[in-house]
Amino acid sequence: MKILVINCGSSSLKYQLINPETEEVFAKGLCERIGIDGSKLEYEVVAKDFEKKLETPMPSHKEALELVISHLTDKEIGVIASVDEVDAIGHRVVHGGEEFAQSVLINDAVLKAIEANNDLAPLHNPANLMGIRTCMELMPGKKNVAVFDTAFHQTMKPEAFMYPLPYEDYKELKVRKYGFHGTSHLYVSGIMREIMGNPEHSKIIVCHLGNGASITAVKDGKSVDTSMGLTPLQGLMMGTRCGDIDPAAVLFVKNKRGLTDAQMDDRMNKKSGILGLFGKSSDCRDLENAVVEGDERAILAESVSMHRLRSYIGAYAAIMGGVDAICFTGGIGENSSMTREKALEGLEFLGVELDKEINSVRKKGNVKLSKDSSKVLIYKIPTNEELVIARDTFRLAK
């Protein structure tokens, strides 16, 4: 069984060829700068530890996918004889709106429904659709499955997802909290439940911390609240995104500085967060080095970020009536021992006891970070969104 997993951005295409039953990754890679000068392909055959990087023009996603297929089927460095060996194709789709609470086989009606949500994710959904249509064109007859970032959070109740705006804004404009990183939160909370012995009842907080960051309360295997909202701008302070701020501050800054809507949107999404407060970089590693060196703005940025993360952990423990486990995932969550330690400072009242010695050692895989005496399990769990997409595609396409 071979599933091709596609994650299409506006100028990028990530791919993996996976066996969802054995979890074996045959090949993976990335096409970037599609439609821009300096287009690049990265191709890796995992079992052979073979990597290739190629700079070649890719005017569109069609040329990018053709290049991927030619490498996958190459006689010398390929992993399949032809695309006939690809059983189905799974696509990451960022926004499923209220229409999709789970992954679906793609047909014309599904394509139209995804397109109808373009307003909710103007940077992502059109690119996702482009990837789907390109696969349909180049590999006709293959089953395609859409796996939505928002689907896992469709179990939230109205008290968690409604905004206290006039009700017609929800009914007519679909303005509400949707949440993102759902595939990651689903996977990590599922692994945590397995570690716990798959109990009937569980209260898990998952912290997906990367350049984009979100936190989710997962009760009995279902998302009951999450930090991101209508868009990925709400919630935690991130690399370049502001997260939660007073909406009136947006209008105040916009008017005082004479900014257009697009400029204000750019300011909140690309110039805020760690970059905005620290001023030198949006990279967590640069921030941590500057904190160690005593940079005052770095210390400020880190303390604001950790204060907000701790606030969410406490709030979600309150919403669920306690917490059994706290999990860290994502590039920062998995690799930054400082972030994990600072995030849990002051949470001893919840029964949280971090083993700082184990936390400071870099280990791969699922790692227990809590002391044996801790009432709350603390784990570092690498996410695997591609595997979730492959499994759902296999389940729906077989």
UniProtKB/Swiss-Prot annotation:
Highest classification ranks of the organism: Bacteria, Fusobacteriati, Fusobacteriota, Fusobacteriia, Fusobacteriales
Cofactor comment text: Mg(2+). Can also accept Mn(2+).
Molecular function in Gene Ontology: acetate kinase activity; ATP binding; magnesium ion binding
InterPro entries given in the database record: Ac/propionate_kinase, Aliphatic_acid_kin_short-chain, Aliphatic_acid_kinase_CS, ATPase_NBD
Name of the protein: Acetate kinase
Annotated metabolic or biological route of this protein: Metabolic intermediate biosynthesis; acetyl-CoA biosynthesis; acetyl-CoA from acetate: step 1/2
Binding site for ATP: 14, 208-212, 283-285, 331-335
Keywords in alphabetical order: ATP-binding, Cytoplasm, Kinase, Magnesium, Metal-binding, Nucleotide-binding, Transferase
Residue(s) at site: Transition state stabilizer: 181, 241
Functional summary from the UniProt entry: Catalyzes the formation of acetyl phosphate from acetate and ATP. Can also catalyze the reverse reaction.
UniProt-annotated catalytic positions: 149
Its EC number(s): 2.7.2.1
